[in-house]
Amino acid sequence: LWDCERSLAELAALCEANHMEAVAEVTQKRQTPETGIVLGSGKLEEAAAAAAELGAECAVFDGELTGSQIRNISTALGGLEVIDRTMLILEIFRSRAVTNEGKLQTELALLRYRLPRLQGMGESLSRQGGGGGGGGGARRGAGETKLELDRRHVHARIDALAEKLAEMEKRRGESRKA
């Protein structure tokens, strides 16, 4: 049986482990979550007011959110960064990784988790790039949205990290044989 108080206490402890202070809690008992925003609009307004009053820098949700939910909630909260429990846990692992391999593994896990949620992160991810303007590999092509560009960069980083990790694994295997 899910215990709301215990889960929120654990979430507050996770925030603390990530050097964040939980300044308010907004809960709602619903049969089914609101599809696009998880909370009802009244509770979301309550959360927005609390966040503004307390100067919150981030809203942490106790559960997994989709990219569109992150975007919708962030918009309703006045552009506040929105993360879910899993992202918070991955951030904790990333910040505590010590070895080079551990750092690469946690960055890879975080990128793989964030990739399908990119549409909800940051602002104006749907803006289109213009054409022209010579050179520059990181530029957007004509009609390429910022979201598409971000996805391309994340895919490239994921590929590079996976390659580095495979290389490390191969070297470790070779040194064991020697």
Q: What do the PLM-derived regions correspond to, one by one?
A:
Residues L1-L90:
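N-terminal accessory targeting/assembly segments
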Residues A12, E16-H19, A52, S74, ...:
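Signal for well-folded cores of large energy- and translation-related assemblies
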Residues V98, Q105, A109-R112, P116, ...:
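Short amphipathic alpha-helical segments with heptad-repeat character
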Residues E64-G78, L104-Y113, G130-R139:
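Short secondary-structure transition/capping segments
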Residues M87-T106:
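Short alpha-helix plus adjacent loop in nuclease-associated cores
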Residues W2, T32-I37, R96-G102, R139, ...:
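Flexible beta-alpha connector loops of hexameric P-loop NTPases
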Residues M121, L125-A178:
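Conserved G1/Walker A P-loop phosphate-binding module
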